[in-house]
């Protein structure tokens, strides 16, 4: 289905929990987070019902997010149920802390691949950024994801000035030997009262300039309409992706909606607009009723975000862990 600006919307990102087993400095509020009660979260049946309805309008791609999605107790059966709806491309974003234990089970259930969030290669720094995480668990998860066939493994890196921007070259260098997709994502305002400051953002052109010191960067495009500009260093096995929501927004070909953990469709990540589907579902709404809400959410999708405008309408009103990253 196309929106008001002729963009084909065929991708849904679903947050299945707001809980997380890490407390990353750029994601969690400085004062902590009050989690949703279990009854406030969409059930498996509600999630699958919504996907089946959206499939009628050309939905083909689903990404499961959180919080940390692997904290959901029945994640394996949920993955299986989503895949059974006929979704062609099913992926999941995780911090990798517990992935190694169930990577094979996730693949068998129908998961196609994973993105693993990792902002440093140094154990001590990882513990600081995540407030206690063990990087060795993530390293093992990357290996297990490869063994299970959840490939290509994509590693999401958020360069933050004064925290980890000195590791950009180390991450990029991983692609010489490994078939990883290393994706550098500009630091965005992800929570209220967090560490986000515009001066901390390392813009994508600076990232590319640093990486180019390692060798010639060749443009490498994939089929699809994702936000990543992709490159390969000459002679490298893997890919480098650049995602620039601030310095070079990709709104003109955005193809996605988000479904929050508490059952609200979010047409744009950085908008106050939300369409509640949970309440109607729990009040005997028909599939036709939910279908109309889905179509409405596409029609009200804005032309672009206004992050750089610093207006009241774009100030963060939920943490990224509740919206789904």
Regions found by a protein language model. Give the residues of each.
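Conserved, mostly hydrophobic/aromatic
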Residues: 16, 64, 263
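A short acidic, helix-capping loop that chelates divalent metal ions and anchors anionic groups
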Residues: 32-37, 122-129, 191-195, 276-278
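Glycine-centered loop/turn positions within well-structured domains
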Residues: 22, 123-124, 249, 275
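Radical SAM/AdoMet-radical enzyme domain recognition
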Residues: 41-64, 68-185
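Auxiliary Fe-S-binding modules of radical SAM enzymes
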Residues: 1-11, 177, 187-325
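Canonical Radical SAM [4Fe-4S] cluster-binding loop centered on the CxxxCxxC motif
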Residues: 4-44
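Short, small-residue-rich loop/turn micro-motifs
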Residues: 18-20, 28-31, 118-120, 186, ...
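Residues that scaffold the ATP/ADP-binding catalytic core of kinase and kinase-like folds
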Residues: 23, 27, 124, 129, ...
């Amino acid at each position: 289905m196309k929106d008001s600006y002729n963009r084909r919307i065929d991708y849904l990102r679903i947050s299945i929990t707001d809980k997380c087993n890490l407390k990353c400095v750029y994601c969690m509020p400085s004062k902590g987070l009050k989690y949703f009660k279990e009854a406030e979260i969409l059930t498996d049946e509600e999630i699958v019902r919504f996907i089946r309805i959206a499939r009628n309008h050309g939905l083909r791609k689903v990404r499961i997010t959180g919080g940390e999605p692997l904290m959901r107790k029945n994640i394996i059966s949920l993955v299986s149920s989503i895949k059974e709806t006929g979704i062609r491309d099913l992926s999941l974003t995780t911090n990798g802390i517990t992935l190694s234990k169930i990577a094979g089970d996730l693949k068998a259930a129908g998961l196609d691949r994973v993105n693993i969030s990792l902002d440093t290669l140094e154990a001590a720094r990882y513990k600081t950024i995540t407030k206690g995480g063990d990087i060795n668990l993530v390293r093992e998860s990357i290996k297990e994801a490869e063994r299970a066939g959840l490939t290509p493994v994509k590693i999401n890196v958020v360069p933050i000035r004064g925290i980890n921007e000195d590791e950009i070259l180390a991450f990029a260098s991983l692609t010489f030997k490994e078939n990883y997709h290393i994706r550098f994502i500009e630091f965005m305002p992800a929570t209220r009262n967090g560490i986000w400051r515009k001066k901390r953002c390392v813009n994508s052109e600076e990232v590319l300039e640093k990486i180019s010191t390692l060798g010639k960067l060749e443009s490498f495009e994939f089929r699809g309409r994702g936000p990543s500009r992709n490159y390969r260093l000459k002679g490298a096995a893997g890919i480098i992706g650049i995602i620039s929501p601030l310095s070079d927004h990709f709104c003109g070909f955005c193809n996605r909606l988000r479904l929050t953990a508490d059952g609200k469709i979010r047409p744009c990540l950085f908008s106050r607009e939300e369409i509640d589907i949970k309440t109607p579902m729990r009040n005997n709404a028909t599939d036709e009723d939910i279908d109309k809400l889905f179509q409405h959410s596409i029609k009200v999708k804005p032309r672009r975000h206004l992050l750089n405008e610093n207006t009241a309408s774009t100030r963060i009103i939920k943490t990224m862990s509740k919206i789904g990253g």
